[in-house]
Amino acid sequence: MKVIYDQVADILTIILTEAPVAESDEDKPGVILDYDDKGNLVSLEILDASRRVNIPSKIEYQVSPIGG
C-alpha cells in the first residue's frame, strides 16, 4: 500500500495494489475509486484533500494485531 499527498494539486491518493486501472467511479463528490478489470479496488483519490482531511500531509499508519 502506498499513500501519496500532492500538495500542489491537493489530492490524497491511497494505492492498494499496482494493478492497472480499468475503470474509475466518483463515489461521492471529490472521492474517486479506481478499479481493475475484475472489479477489485485498486486505489482511491480524495480531491481537495485539505478541505476534507485534517492535515493531509501527516499520515499515520497502524496495523491491528491479528484477532484483535
Explain the meaning of each model-derived region:
Residues M1-G68:
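Small, basic N-terminal interaction modules of short regulatory proteins
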